[in-house]
Amino acid sequence: MRVPLAAPLQVTATVAGLFAPRPVLGYVATESDATLRQILEYDTVAVVGCSTTPGKAAHDIPRYLVDHGYDVIPVNPFADEIFGRTAYDSLTDVPDEIDIVDVFRPSEEVPGILDEVLDRADVKALWLQLDIRDEDAAKRAREAGIEVVQDRCLKVEHQRLD
């Protein structure tokens, strides 16, 4: 359930267990904790931009998801395998059902990623990691019945709500 808010918020993010202010002008959080919990109940997460490099968020966060029981599908055209799992060139190439698409690519790439999401009939949620936002793409996804989370870390929210 979405809770409408009257004014922009100052959003905070947990980084290494500390709270750091992350003001985002004009951004109003629309994802309630109940909605986030519902999304986090899904099983299969395709990670667009999944990295082979330990120490990078695009590697360590998907690794965390694997370690916490999620079926992670790496999407990276420059890798054959990540975490012992087949890496796919694009969402279009993934033969398995996908519940969540977790994006670790620049905001400018979100519309193209969303096009691939909309070509599938199985994606229930589009999750854009910290500093990744695209209001037009989010609107298109929501109009198609897909939940959207922007500018939030899936790992941080999992830890906070678990």
Residues of each region from the PLM?
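ADP-ribose/adenylate-binding Rossmann-like module
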Residues: R120-A141
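Structural motif
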Residues: D99-I100, A125
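Glycine-rich, highly charged phosphate/nucleotide-binding loops
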Residues: Y27-E31, E81-D96, D102-G112
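Hydrophobic, well-ordered beta-alpha structural blocks that scaffold small-molecule cofactor pockets
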Residues: V15-F78, F83
